[in-house]
Amino acid sequence: SAASDVYKRQDAKYLFANDTCHWILVDTLYISPLLFPERPYHRLVKDDKLICEQMNNPVNDCKKAKDLLLDEIACWNLLSKKKRVLFASLLKDKKEFEGFLSMVSAEYIHEGIPKLIKELYAGKICQHADLDMLIEQYPCGLAYALALIDTTDYRSITPGWVLYNYPEVEFIVKLLRHTTCHEGCDYCHTQLDILYNLKTFFGYECFRTYEGEPLQERATQAAVEGKSLLAIFPTGGGKSLTFQLPALMAGRSVHGLTVVISPLQSLMKDQVDNLADRGITDAVTINGMLDPITRSLSIQRVQDGEASLLYISPEMLRSKTIERILIARHVVRFVIDEAHCFSSWGHDFRVDYLYIGKFIRKYQQKKKCKNPIPVSCFTATAKQKVIQDICDYFKQTLDLNLDLFASTASRTNLHYSVIHVESDNDKYLKLRELVAESDCPTIVYVSRTKRTKELAGKLTRDGYKALPFDGKMEADEKNANQDAFMNDQVHIICLL
């Protein structure tokens, strides 16, 4: 892209300065994403220069550019006549495309373009989208958006350089494919219907209710409609589905990425594994529990468009690698789990959470977003001061108003008791007694890292097989211990 722009700015003005020159300037770079949208990269691969110290080979570059041009011409001719007319009519006055369109003797129309789009993309876009506005204001972006919509693989993504030069592409795809119309159409009634997609992705017929309240369904619908929200769900109340379903829907409709920010690394792995067990491989996590090879593969999956859900910890937002891979993707929503960590009134306050708004603002500026990226916040804490702190934070940093979804239902399946003991030895004996009585998966919380290993070892020696889990363990050991607990190989895990 850079070389192409340098050529047009510096070399072309000398080559074409003579009025007697009748050469046509064709830039294959701009044509490739239109004709090869399944590939998120330019098809001109310089495989003779895989080592960065090697010298450029301009002759070979020219040969490859010629081969690419011939491929593009062949692909253009394979398009239906109506699709050729559509692309040509959208791009006819644009310098980036005029050379190629002249070379292929493209035909144009001046009227009836919206009707042609509706005919060619029936069932793929909302039939009530404002096509006249898009054609008038964003013809190039619309052409690239339609090319992406044509792809059969939802993991295909628009190349980063296209998004940089035509940032409106993401806005257009969202308008055409992920904005529910008020009038109602076949596309919106199926692809944007949450009950239809709940059955498609998870096999459920209906959403969970809380003492008759359809909280899960209402919060999911709000997310699909692009609203920012704060949901107060009881622990184990199905909050994951509330953001996973909209994320999967957006992955299919706009090739989008939902970023889930959580301080709980073990929970990230658990959710990714649970989705994989359902045959949903769209989720990826990048955190400190990963070894370098697995981390590299996860990053590659995000870059290649294979991920619709990315789980990261808040401190990862300071990583330049994370920023780079997110800039190249269409981020449709930020989900913040354990949102009470924003509030300085709680014991779980985390300074890294205060960077989230700054990161989102910087991301929106770099991507030249036309609309704010919505956020979903989840917490099980319903204290009014904490709720106000969360709402105030997003209003002040991103000018977002959060719709509140709070359940009045209480957790009837939880029982608490406080047991008095005189000494540490009495405490251990009572714990061992409780473990023996229960004979079920048990999590024992301790206050110090060293105690996780000490207590797990002591329980194991007494015949109650247990494993430790804390932040200072090696990633491989943490993953192995978590898997052993989740797969019922051990019933007790000692957690910091």
Predicted segments with their positions:
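Short, small-residue-biased leader/transition segments that mark boundaries at the very start
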Residues: A2-Y7
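Short, polar loop motifs at secondary-structure junctions
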Residues: R9-F16, L496
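Substrate-recognition/cap helix-loop segment adjacent to the acidic, metal-dependent catalytic center
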Residues: K13-W23, D389
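Short alpha-helix plus adjacent loop in nuclease-associated cores
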Residues: T20, L25-L50, H340-H347, A480-N481
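Acidic, Mg2+-coordinating catalytic module of metal-dependent nucleases/exonucleases
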Residues: K46-H128
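Interdomain "pre-motor" coupling segment immediately N-terminal to P-loop NTPase/helicase cores
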Residues: E136-T190
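Helicase motor core with emphasis on the C-terminal RecA-like subdomain
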Residues: D186-L192, Y196, T200-F202, P214, ...
